[in-house]
Each structure stands twice: as C-alpha cells, then as structure tokens.
Amino acid sequence: MAETTALIDYGAGNLHSVENALRTVGASVTVTADPDTVRTADRIVLPGVGSFRACAEGLRAIPGLIEAMEERVEVGGAPFLGVCVGMQLLADRGLEHGATPGLGWIAGEVRAIEQTDPAIKVPHMGWNDVALTAHAGPVLEEGEAYFLHSFHFAAENPADIAAMTDHGGGLVAAVARDNVLGVQFHPEKSQAYGLGLLERFLQWRP
C-alpha cells in the first residue's frame, strides 16, 4: 500500500501548487484538515503563506488539528515538512502583528528582516543560494531556491539550523530536528531543486 502524505488544509493558501509538486514526484497526497486523517498519515506537509498570526489562528481554529499533528509527528515520529510560514510556525512565537504563539517544536522566534542597507530589498524575494550546515541531514542539498518572505526564523539552538541563505546578512533557510524539517523557501516554486527536495522527503526514513 502506498504511503500517504497529508497536506494540511487550514486556509493558508498555496495548497494547489504544493499538492501538484508532491504529485509530480509520486506522492499519494490527501489534502485534509481532519485530525483522524492526520493521525494515520505516513508523512505530513504544512504549507503556509501570509502572516504568522493569520496562519497560527487558522490552525488553532480547527478543533483537534494541532493535537493530531503533535501526536503523529512529535510522538509517532512521522516525517514532517513545513514550507515558508509552515516552517515559521515551528517556532515558539512569531512577532508579526504582535506576539503570537507557534507550535513550539523548534526553539526560536520569527522576527522581521532588518533592512540595514537600502540596496537590500524587503521582502526577500527571488532566487538565492541555500548553504547547508553540519546539521542539514539527507533531505537538503546545496543549490538555489525561490524565497518570498519579510520575516525570518531566529533559531535559539544552532544545532537546529539546517541551512542558511544570505540577504544583507545570514538568514535561516531551513531548520531540522529529528523527523521535523522546515524550509523558508518554496520547493514548489524552485523547479528542479525543489522537486528534488520533495522527492528526498518522500524517501526520508528519520
């Protein structure tokens, strides 16, 4: 029986493009907000576009969804991928439109990108290098990916930082711990690089 990948639908956009990219690399995708479906999924992908607060509130508005994700990922060990704001939601809190609690799976907070140089544009938009750290793991590879964000994940523990990018200074491009991976960039917009990442995610056995 094919493994199932639950793509969490909580009103946070970009579902269709992420779903298409996952199907392109052979995933059996279930788009869902149903806690029982999440509990039985082999893999979980949490997308997200827009503000941290709106995404966090969208998740919390669905009864039992966060608890099901925690049960399947944090307790059950299912491989998890967070994309863009879905990655940021792994943090303890986000500071966009005031402090908002995140999932708290990876210590840190999501802060605005500081524009210290007028030549460096915010939002950080377009293709940029993904430079791996010693904690990258098997899913990530060096390359160029497509970014679109005005806030960044400030991780407390350097061991949780899997990749960096440079935009007027270092920004976290990916975080990882055990079976949890989050990427700030958009794999579904990153052409061959992004499809390769999704394919390796489907093969990942943390």
Locations of regions flagged by a protein language model:
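Extreme N-terminal starter segment of soluble prokaryotic enzymes
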Residues: 2-6
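Short hydrophobic segments within beta-strands
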Residues: 8-10
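Divalent-cation-assisted or electrostatically stabilized phosphate/pyrophosphate-binding catalytic cores
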Residues: 18
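Conserved beta-strand hairpin/beta-sheet module of binuclear metal-dependent hydrolase folds
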Residues: 23-24, 39-53
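Structural signature of beta-strand start/N-cap positions in the alpha/beta core
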Residues: 28, 43, 79-81, 144
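Short acidic low-complexity segments
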Residues: 29-40
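Cysteine-nucleophile active-site neighborhood
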Residues: 50-124
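Amide-donor transfer/coupling interface in amidating biosynthetic enzymes
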Residues: 74-75, 108-206
